């Protein structure tokens, strides 16, 4: 079977959420019922941007960016057993930049 690829439209992005924390900093395991919904992930695909007042607005994020988003942002989808989120770029709160 062919691998499915998602191509988002307009100002939408596809994000692969980071897995939820399995245990606390002190080493206690967190049960599934108490795990926080992830709010960070990696951008997998980016739409072409949107048109506003006749001007094309380019996207601020790109594939591979690590981003923060709201707890209830986006639409959850499952493809080939993998969980993804599709959301508008405006639902992304920020890009995580690692210091070197």
Swiss-Prot record:
GO molecular function per UniProt: ATP binding; metal ion binding; protein folding chaperone; protein-folding chaperone binding; unfolded protein binding
UniProt xrefs under SMART domains: Cpn10
Superkingdom to which the source organism belongs: Bacteria
UniProt entry keywords in alphabetical sequence: Chaperone, Cytoplasm
InterPro entries recorded: Chaperonin_GroES (IPR020818), Chaperonin_GroES_sf (IPR037124), Chaprnonin_Cpn10_CS (IPR018369), GroES-like_sf (IPR011032)
GO biological process terms on file: chaperone cofactor-dependent protein refolding
Subcellular locations according to the entry: Cytoplasm
Pfam families assigned: Cpn10
Main location: cytoplasm
GO annotations of cellular component type: cytoplasm
Record family assignment: Belongs to the GroES chaperonin family.
Described function: Together with the chaperonin GroEL, plays an essential role in assisting protein folding. The GroEL-GroES system forms a nano-cage that allows encapsulation of the non-native substrate proteins and provides a physical environment optimized to promote and accelerate protein folding. GroES binds to the apical surface of the GroEL ring, thereby capping the opening of the GroEL channel.
Subunit-structure text: Heptamer of 7 subunits arranged in a ring. Interacts with the chaperonin GroEL.
PANTHER family (alphabetical): 10 KDA HEAT SHOCK PROTEIN, CO-CHAPERONIN GROES
Name of the featured protein: Co-chaperonin GroES
Originating organism: Rhodothermus marinus
